[in-house]
Amino acid sequence: MEVNIEALEKLLDNKFNGNQTAFAEATGLERTHVNKVFKNKGKGAGALFCGAIIKYCEKNNLDYREYIFLQ
C-alpha cells in the first residue's frame, strides 16, 4: 500500500484547515507519525497509517481508494 499524498494534503486542508493535530486525533494516529508522513511526502506511511485512513474513510463515507493506492 502507498498513500496518495496529494489527496491526503487536500483532505488535511479541506477538513482540518491544515491542522495535523486535528487530523491525527480524527484518525487515531500519533501526531508525530502524521507529521512525519506529510513532511516526507508519504514515506513512512505503513500498515498502521493506511489502516487508520481506511477506518476514517469508512466512518465518514469517503472512498479510501482516493487516499491509498493498493498495489
Describe the function of each predicted region.
Residues 1-22, 26:
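A short, Lys/Arg-rich alpha-helix, primarily the initiator
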Residues 9, 54-57:
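Residue-level detector of alpha-helical secondary structure
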Residues 13, 39-42, 58:
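Residue-level detection of the helix-turn-helix DNA-binding "recognition helix"
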Residues 28-45:
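Recognition helix of helix-turn-helix/homeodomain-like DNA-binding domains
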Residues 58-71:
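Short C-terminal boundary/hinge segments that cap the last helix of small helical domains
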